[in-house]
Amino acid sequence: MADGRHNASRGRGNRRSEATKGTLANEERLRALGQAVEHRANPSRPVRAAKVRRSHRGRRIAIISSVVVLALLIALVGGGYLYAQWRFSQIPKVNVVGELPQLSGRPFNILEIGSDSRAGLTGTVARQTGASTNSVAGQRSDVVKIMHVDPAAGTITILSIPRDTMVTLLANQALFGKFNRINVNYGNGPSLLAQTITANFGIPINHVIQVSFAGLINAAVALGGVYLDFPYPAKDAYSGLNIPHPGCQLITGFQALAVARSRHYQWFQNGVWNYDGTSDFGRIDRQNAFLRAMISRAKSLYNPLTINSFLSKIPQGITLDSGFSLNELIAFAVKFHSFNPSNMLTYTLPTVPATVGLLGDVLFAQQPEAQQLLVNIFGSSLLTPTNPPPNAQLQTPLPPVVATTTTTTTIASTSSTRATATKTTTAGAATKSPSNPTAVMPYFDPVPCTP
């Protein structure tokens, strides 16, 4: 293994950012702001200091909305409520039908959609992603994640649903059939995707955040790039990834997008280009690593100019549901301002591969493992599916009844045993999600690092 990976691992053990200075003062100001906002909304309630609990230890983070929350949080601390309110008003909003109201103090779920829309891309970047300068190509949800936030427990959990997962469609069946991949639902906007997730899996959706190609690129550029340690030279001819040298290096612009999009990842080891055949599962892991690095980078930049640049670029490629209020973001920030990203739990829906007619290689929810994971994550808030996903026989049985376990850590990330990938796997094949309870990041994948 490359020395860079060893050094990065050693550095991750005990790292302090430049933001350590003044942290206590910032926290006091943040708590005071949160109390003021809460009192404004509920003047009859006494103002009490926010208590932050430690969460269970997790593995990786995969959520660009955390970066948005963090940036707004820093703006609040450094620039005041009115400035953050103005910046928040600049973020595009979309009406989402089917959302359930968020109840104060109760767990809630944020649907995170990574769209393959090329809107906002121009010139070389547009051509590299397959779009011309005058057209917008693609409108599918290549990233589908549900962020489960439990304010009382102080925990955050991320569930990823692979894009090839088969679901029962609620609309457009004449065009796509009764059953199809989950990512075809996004062409009509986030409402249909949110409703499909609830109908198929019983997961209630309270909020939505969408991120396009331009949104991810702009966020990385505004932060001055993120640092990732590549243990080997790497490339992906499909996404455009090109890392000629190993080691900890700054990734920004188009290469940042290329890392997050990489499904055909190759690494150069012992004179041979090796191929990661795990497809979407590999991409999920690399997205998690990239976004964890992005959040670490954002947390280290308590620079008003940098944060202002980041906030100014948020409207270019990021959209929130119209019901997501600034006060809710502030409450979220007050509760989780000391939350360590490494303590976030991440999971991938257990699936099994199959080939279905013209659809080719797809994935089906693996039962009872999938239902067990959903129950463990969402608990009593999980609803009974009205349109369950199909099994490999294209039948739609109700999910099995399973018991809630004492802790969600009993089921590890299902994208955790990818180190068995070989260069002989068919490029476009859907791959079964591993179920090894020991979550280990593949040795060839990039990880966050400190230069």
Stretch-by-stretch model annotation:
Residues 2-451:
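Non-catalytic, solvent-exposed segments at the cell envelope interface
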